[in-house]
Amino acid sequence: MPDVTLTTLQSLKQGGDKIAMLTCYDATFARAACQAGVDVLLVGDSLGMVLQGHDSTLPVSVEEMAYHTACVKRGNQGALILTDLPFMAYATAEQAMNNSARLMQAGAHMVKLEGAGWLAEPIRLLAERGVPVCAHLGLTPQAVNILGGYKVQGRQEAQARQMRADAMALEQAGAAMLLLECVPSELAAEITQAVKIPVIGIGAGAATDGQVLVQHDMLGLSLSGRAPKFVRNFMEGQSSIHGALSAYVQAVKDGSFPAAEHGFSA
């Protein structure tokens, strides 16, 4: 198969074909995910929680993100690698450019920034300099202390209206992809229709252009022992991790995941 690029993802959206994304932090899992047909490997700052055992993503550094990106690159077999810029790594224009360069040099094909409409300026700066950006809206874990916990975002009409406006503004600024986390399914569907760029969901219903899960969650592993509402354990009925990965990709591609039970209402 040819390598997955931004053009590939755009074509999948235009053709109505779903995009399968999964978090990945090492070479071995990267290879297995690629063999299962995962389109995008997300080197997420979620590693701070699932690998390092922190109670949030805030302690993760750019150096750690670059290290895991390089690990994933070595095992990658054609997927697009998307890497998170961690907490406060893009607080200024200079930080955004320097830290994005560090991650791209480590092997990322694209970087992800969490926030809202204020991301327009760093996205514009990065896009103009050849760095593809995915904007992350909705529940943004780096802002967990402001949000008051890990809660669904966009349930109030004012919030929903602002999120729709932010999505369109960030596309206009140059964002090449959008990720919506813990957003009411109806709102996510509206945003997906309103923008031309691919929209990936996690806890955002089935109408987005693709889905992403944290690898540990989809394998039934959790430090807390309780999976979020939007997670399905793909190890159930499977005898191997390879089987679970293939089942995840198939379920995303054929639209059977997520089901209505995995989404949120307004």
Swiss-Prot record:
It comes from the Bacteria. Pathway: Cofactor biosynthesis; (R)-pantothenate biosynthesis; (R)-pantoate from 3-methyl-2-oxobutanoate: step 1/2. Its cofactor is Mg(2+). This is 3-methyl-2-oxobutanoate hydroxymethyltransferase. It is found in: Cytoplasm. It catalyses: 3-methyl-2-oxobutanoate + (6R)-5,10-methylene-5,6,7,8-tetrahydrofolate + H2O = 2-dehydropantoate + (6S)-5,6,7,8-tetrahydrofolate. It comes from Ectopseudomonas mendocina (strain ymp). One of its GO terms (cellular component) is cytoplasm. The active site is at 181 (proton acceptor). Homodecamer; pentamer of dimers. Catalyzes the reversible reaction in which hydroxymethyl group from 5,10-methylenetetrahydrofolate is transferred onto alpha-ketoisovalerate to form ketopantoate. Belongs to the PanB family.
